[in-house]
Amino acid sequence: MVLSVLFVTITIKAEEKKLKHLRHFVCFKYKNNISEDKITEIEKDFIKLEKKIDDIKGFEKGLNNSPEGLNKGFKHCYLITFDSKEGRDRYLVHSDHKKFSELVGPVVEDVFVVDYWATK
């Protein structure tokens, strides 16, 4: 009986761990003089990080379309998914992420980042 309860508990904990994802939400406010072609080029480089950095488990991008008008000029949004805090931390110091940061730095007016554990 005790072994059955222990097995069920371990199984539930393993399932819970699989469902947890660390989300790294990034918004860019590009400078006004940056062309859409340049933004597209930068986004392609950002997306390539998913193939270069094993810790990235998912990458999504999109444009703000909220009718509320509360985006404070942030239009380009990116959601990067990690399985662990350690994976996110490795991403932050990864040489390819550093190179991308150097590329995007001169063309953005501001950056907004929020990390959170996704739960259901």
What are these regions (language model features)?
Residues 7-74, 83-90, 116-120:
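Short S/T/G/P-rich N-terminal loop/turn motif that feeds into the first structured element of a domain
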Residues 77-120:
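Surface-exposed, polar helix/loop patches in the mature regions of secreted/periplasmic/lumenal proteins
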Residues 1-7:
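Bacterial N-terminal signal peptides
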